[in-house]
Amino acid sequence: MPRYDDRYGNTRLYVGRLSSRTRTRDLERLFSRYGRVRDVDMKRDYAFVEFSDPRDADDARYYLDGRDFDGSRITVEASRGAPRGSRDNGSRGPPPGSGRCFNCGVDGHWARDCTAGDWKNKCYRCGERGHIERNCKNSPSPKKARQGGSYSRSPVKSRSPRRRRSPSRSRSYSRGRSYSRSRSPVRREKSVEDRSRSPKAMERSVSPKGRDQSLSPDRKVIDASPKRGSDYDGSPKENGNGRNSASPIVGGGESPVGLNGQDRSPIDDEAELSRPSPKGSESP
């Protein structure tokens, strides 16, 4: 089975990725090895070579595609479009001018099928190399494009402030928690002070010695009260009514204490009055 198909009789080849040093005569010398070359159309970095026999063209494409020539690896493919000025268009692709490539500027194929040079690094808007359409100076800037579409996004902007309030709520909540945590030790100190002021704590803090001192005056009053039927009072201390029984009277008054230092109680006086005197018994 032959490696070529001459159904369309394609004798025109596309040669791409040529070096800047390559000339027309260099291409004629290279392709003339495989057959008779009819025409060589040289461009900036690509060229079109036309053979007299389609089989010679297919042989040249088979052996020269991907070969290093003049310091560059060239690509050789069958041209899909008819050359300019050709009257016999037939059914081989679109008419001249209708299928122009944005990459190489040649009619007969599309940019996605072009293999002339580094076609991926060429701008489809201005046709220059070294940048793409997105970075082209002639293309509209993204800022203007965003401004043009801002009218349709206006409802979204009106909703955006509501969404921005949510972080502030979370911040206030976090602040409140941190504030309450910082105040918690003060509350604990207050609770300790209240416990220390409670009556139970005060009773626990009082020593047994203090209890005896606080209860000693009552016991002294009870011990100092004169007992019934006793003639003597041990010491000039307070009785049950809180009065001194042997306090001296200022102003030369007589003391109720007798000559012998005995303390006369009212009960003893009543007993003496009730007794009969010996003189009365002796009287007639």
Swiss-Prot record:
Residues 159-180 have a biased composition (Basic residues). It is found in: Nucleus. It holds the Pfam family zf-CCHC. It comes from the Eukaryota. One of its GO terms (molecular function) is zinc ion binding. Residues 11-81 form the RRM domain. A zinc finger (CCHC-type) spans 99-116, 121-138. Residues 74-97, 132-284 are annotated as: Disordered. Component of the spliceosome. Coiled coil: none annotated. The splicing pattern of the pre-mRNA is regulated in a tissue-specific manner and by development, and changes in response to various types of abiotic stresses. This is Serine/arginine-rich splicing factor RS2Z32. InterPro entries: Nucleotide-bd_a/b_plait_sf (IPR012677), RBD_domain_sf (IPR035979), RRM_dom (IPR000504), Znf_CCHC (IPR001878), Znf_CCHC_sf (IPR036875). SMART domains: RRM, ZnF_C2HC. One of its GO terms (cellular component) is spliceosomal complex. Extensively phosphorylated on serine residues in the RS domain. The keyword Repressor does not apply. Residues 186-203, 209-236 have a biased composition (Basic and acidic residues). One of its GO terms (biological process) is RNA splicing.
